[in-house]
């Protein structure tokens, strides 16, 4: 009888328990198992659903691994920047993520009861305990606080350039010369963009990027903001760039330069996130970080997340 009872237990151990415990990510001394990753993805998936947003399960695994690693690196460097997270901040961050912005006060007993009920419902839906839930939010807060700290050095006033984009199929020399001639002669580049761009949204403003500072479009910084007179000059067509996704070519024009404009909130956020990304890229070379992701792990985690989504919705 004992022998027969051990067989199902050993089968459960090898087929159910052990796969969950395999390491998916290691950052210094902290290990994240497949189970941790499934819970992290389900946490963010459920938050997206609560906010009424679509959640792309196909790309979520890689994004979640990267975000887990970044959160852990932020936590590792928190002391260096004097960063801490209090208990009340965890609760506040959670109800903000749920979209409870207005007329909500955690100091009110009634609102606190509503919050507790929402939290219990949320945890039951994704099947994780409160300690794990708090740890996920706590590490994400360290990431956000690090971003704010690094952003302190961003100048409020910066050089901006007014950028246009033209989508083309015909990039023959004769066509480009014709466009260049008209741009040189005009004081209203917007009309030229609308005349030649094949972007179906051009009449609704597509192709008009407006005032752009360095870092707002990092992939094109070298074109607009290179040093030593290497940057694109005003009213000069750039070389054509291939947009493979839309099967068109893109050319860029700078219409004007302002040496001191105040950063918009949107551009500040983009630049801030870029600085944080650079920080993580630099520090990831210094910390012991290992990914345990192969095809079998990828498929296993996706299957578990999909099953959890079906049964917990």
Whereabouts are the PLM-identified features?
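Short, low-structural-confidence N-terminal segments
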Residues: 1-60, 293-313
């Amino acid at each position: 009888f004992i022998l027969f009872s051990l067989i199902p237990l050993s089968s459960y151990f090898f087929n159910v328990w052990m796969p969950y415990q395999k390491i998916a990510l290691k950052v210094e001394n902290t290990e994240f198992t497949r189970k941790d990753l499934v819970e992290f993805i389900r946490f963010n998936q459920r938050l997206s659903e609560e906010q009424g947003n679509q959640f792309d399960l196909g790309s979520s695994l890689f994004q979640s691994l990267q975000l887990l690693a970044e959160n852990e690196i932020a936590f590792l460097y928190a002391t260096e920047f004097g960063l801490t997270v209090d208990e009340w901040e965890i609760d506040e961050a959670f109800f903000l993520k749920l979209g409870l912005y207005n007329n909500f006060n955690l100091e009110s007993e009634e609102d606190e009861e509503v919050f507790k009920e929402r939290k219990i419902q949320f945890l039951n839906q994704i099947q994780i305990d409160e300690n794990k839930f708090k740890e996920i939010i706590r590490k994400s807060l360290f990431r956000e606080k690090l971003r704010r700290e690094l952003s302190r050095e961003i100048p409020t006033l910066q050089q901006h350039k007014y950028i246009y984009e033209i989508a083309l199929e015909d990039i023959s020399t004769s066509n480009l010369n014709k466009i260049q001639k008209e741009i040189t002669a005009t004081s209203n580049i917007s009309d030229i963009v609308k005349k030649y761009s094949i972007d179906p949204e051009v009449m609704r403003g597509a192709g008009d990027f407006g005032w752009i500072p360095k870092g707002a479009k990092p992939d094109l910084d070298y074109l607009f903001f290179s040093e030593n007179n290497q940057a694109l000059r005003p009213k000069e067509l750039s070389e054509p760039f291939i947009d493979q996704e839309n099967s068109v070519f893109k050319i860029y024009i700078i219409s004007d330069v302002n040496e001191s404009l105040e950063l918009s909130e949107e551009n500040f956020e983009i630049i801030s996130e870029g600085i944080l990304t650079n920080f993580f890229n630099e520090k990831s070379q210094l910390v012991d970080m290992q990914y345990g992701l192969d095809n079998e792990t990828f498929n296993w985690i996706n299957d578990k997340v999909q099953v959890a989504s079906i049964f917990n919705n």
